[in-house]
């Protein structure tokens, strides 16, 4: 008597996303090659033609393929997403299917993008002091940021600096997705009226945001007009 037993194993492909600029709804295309072009069948709902199958997997999801014959060699490759800003690392992308332990393949795509923030100081009005220094505070939602970014030095997500009229400071390479708030000290006691644009918002990768603060100060005087008559024959009633 000769007894035969077929053995099968599983292949699990996991897709991970990392970085500050990712979309969990994005799908990523994979090619699974079983290194045997005689395989024309379906394993675990995945159809293989001449030993090759193409599948799409969303970020942070996985695909399990059961019923692959024990001892089958495999190679998993992901489409090249460098053009979309992703850097890809992989683990166990090649190997052999085993009956006892599933083959686990992991791909991690990382994408980080960065944006810039510029704070402008402008003056207007007939009594603005061009030598006046104005104090600003920039607060980021990420309190772990403590470093120099362009013209701004942050400590625990906060940067302070002074600007005169016509000057600006630029923070470069701030992480995509963090929020910011720019506050100028109150100078109303000096007669300034302040208007501002984009003083709060969210940093967007590969974009530049301009926060503009305009302080206006006008002063006004009075004009008195008097009429003086001279001579020995004037009419004071005129």
Segment roles from a protein language model:
Residues 1-238:
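Solvent-exposed loop/turn and edge beta-strand elements of beta-rich ligand-binding domains
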């Amino acid at each position: 008597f000769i007894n035969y037993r077929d053995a099968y194993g599983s292949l699990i492909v996991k897709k991970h996303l990392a970085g500050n600029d990712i979309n969990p709804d994005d799908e990523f295309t994979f090619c699974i090659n079983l290194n045997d072009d005689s395989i024309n069948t379906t394993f675990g709902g995945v159809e293989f033609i001449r030993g090759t199958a193409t599948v799409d997997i969303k970020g942070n999801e996985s695909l399990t393929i059961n019923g692959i014959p024990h001892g089958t060699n495999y190679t998993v490759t992901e489409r090249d997403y460098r053009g979309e800003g992703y850097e890809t690392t992989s683990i166990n992308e090649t190997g052999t299917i085993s009956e006892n332990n599933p083959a686990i393949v992991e791909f991690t795509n990382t994408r980080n993008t960065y944006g810039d923030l510029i704070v402008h100081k402008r003056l207007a009005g007939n009594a603005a002091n061009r030598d006046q220094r104005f104090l600003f505070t920039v607060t980021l939602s990420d309190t772990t940021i403590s470093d120099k970014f362009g013209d701004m030095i942050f400590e625990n997500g906060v940067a302070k600096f002074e600007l005169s009229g016509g000057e600006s400071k630029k923070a470069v390479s701030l992480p995509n997705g963090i929020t910011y708030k720019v506050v100028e000290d109150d100078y109303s006691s000096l007669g300034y009226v302040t208007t501002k644009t984009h003083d709060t918002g969210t940093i967007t990768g590969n974009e530049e945001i301009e926060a503009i603060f305009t302080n206006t100060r006008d002063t006004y005087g009075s004009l008195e007009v008097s009429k003086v008559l001279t001579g020995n024959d004037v009419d004071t009633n005129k």
